[in-house]
Amino acid sequence: MVDHKKLSFLIVLFLFSINLIVWQVVFSLNEQDSLEITFFDIGQGDSIFIETPYKSQILIDGGPNSTILEKLVEEMPFWDKTIDLIILTHPEADHMSGLLNVLESYNVKRILWTGIIRDTAQYKKWREMIEKENAEIIIAHSSQEIKIGDVSLNILYPLESLEGKEFKDSNNTSIVCRLSFKNNSFLFTGDATKVSENKIIAKTDCDSDVLKVGHHGSKTSTSREFLENVSPDIAVISCGRDNPYKHPHEQVLKNLEELGINILRTDQDGDIKIVSNGNYLIINN
């Protein structure tokens, strides 16, 4: 015999669930006025998630492990399993390992990286996975521009293609890119050292509102000259709590403080979200 009360309840529950999903989609599609950039608290590594006003998603690096998957679930709708662009700044484990997990779990449309050669097991796994992904592969070099709606991503480094070249230390091959949205700009530096910084500022005005500090705040990066050229209002340092490298270095912090730059750190502040309407920035952490 049919239990009409139970059947009615199940129908109402089903309709409510469908209605909730529809409204989530509607609200998601209508939020087209702000850029959101989240610097993940990913441990001793880097991972930055960017969502454009029209909901295109960019992931710069993936951190050292599968924690990135937990972070993405917090930022992306449960039905969305596509990332528009992944950027691997350089193939070191603390930037690359998490991307292997991402490639297993998400469809990726485009991959931007340097194409350099390294002799590590993780690197070989990376090459195998991106070849199977069926994504558009872009080899980074300066003067490239990637446009996504109102958002522009300009590649500042490396100055020329490094594809097919082998490096034991890949920090100085890191992709450095500047993202612009109307009147706001963000500079992402990977693990670029002072050597790369000097080459960049010799060619380019890097003025930006927000700087992702190079190499987790190591003394190898973020020279005073570079900071004066970038002239950021905000500096974000991505590093792990009580990390064995003692990042960030006290001299880097001193340089930032003396120049009056607001410092945010993932080891102290957790996930750091910066929202831009193209003119103003709001910090959530």
PLM regions and their residue ranges:
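Non-globular, low-confidence helical/coil segments that flank catalytic cores
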Residues: V2-N285
